[in-house]
Amino acid sequence: MDNTFNISVILPLHSSKIRDFDEFFNKAITSITTQKVLPKEVVIVHTDEESLVGYLNSFNFENLNVKKVLYKGEPNYSSQINLGVKEASSEWISFFEFDDEYSQIWFNNVKKYSEIYPDVESFLPIVIDVNDKSVFAGFTNEATFAANFAQEMGLLTNDMLHNYQNFQTAGMAIKKKVIEDFGGFKSSIKLTFVYEFLLRMTYNSVKMMTIPKLGYKHINMRPDSLFWDYKFGPDKISEQEVKFWVSTAKKEYFFTDDRNIKYTESV
């Protein structure tokens, strides 16, 4: 029995100097090595930070096929993910974060569901959100099964996204060809780049399905994380700017390319 699936895990890293990095990273990688079905490869897109490079070179990835890709330039989550997708050699892609964890059955479920539903081009996990102390904070992606949102149970649609925004791409499986055809994350869009991506995929008739099982654990608002900085850090975003980026996502998903959007005061 083949215990691998034709999927590349894309893991962007910008620094090993983040608080509790070693603990988070070990748990994240362990959540991959203990999968019932292993991914074909893990693509780590990292900066040239000396301590990070040294850490990765000495880390024991056990049974994983790891490809390390150097990202040159200012660290940027969207751009690093996009580079990882470009360098990936698999049919499927999964976006991962160093402080998150896959459930042990996730890739096994994706493999099974992809065989049962060959027309589906992306599978979303039910995400359990926790804080940095592992205290439960809620679920994400479960709304595709809500009768007041879902037109067809389990499927994410463009109309649904216009009515409800709480969906995320962390842990998802999506065909590489879909990203090649309709574009990756847009690095110029702050805060709502995930929302814009999902709007764009569904607008282009990409069939996206949530697998009704817990598939991913996500640390929500970890101190010093990207979205924590948007709310509390030096890059704090005002309520007016939040409205701007939500409005921008709803306008930009018609375009495949990143049009280098800049924040302006009026919406």
Predicted regions, residues:
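Conserved donor NDP-sugar-binding/catalytic core segment of glycosyltransferases
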Residues: 105-142
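Short, flexible, basic/aromatic active-site loop/helix in glycosyltransferases
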Residues: 141-164
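Short beta-strand/loop segment that forms part of the nucleotide-sugar
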Residues: 39-49, 69-71
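Acidic donor-binding loop at a coil-to-helix junction in glycosyltransferase catalytic cores
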Residues: 190-197
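Glycine-rich, basic loop-to-helix element that forms the pyrophosphate-binding segment
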Residues: 71-88
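Nucleotide-sugar-dependent glycosyltransferase catalytic core
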Residues: 136-140, 188-190, 203-207, 211-243
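Short aromatic/hydrophobic "clamp" motif used to bind/position activated sugar donors
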Residues: 93
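Short, acidic, metal-binding catalytic loop of nucleotide-sugar glycosyltransferases
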Residues: 27-39
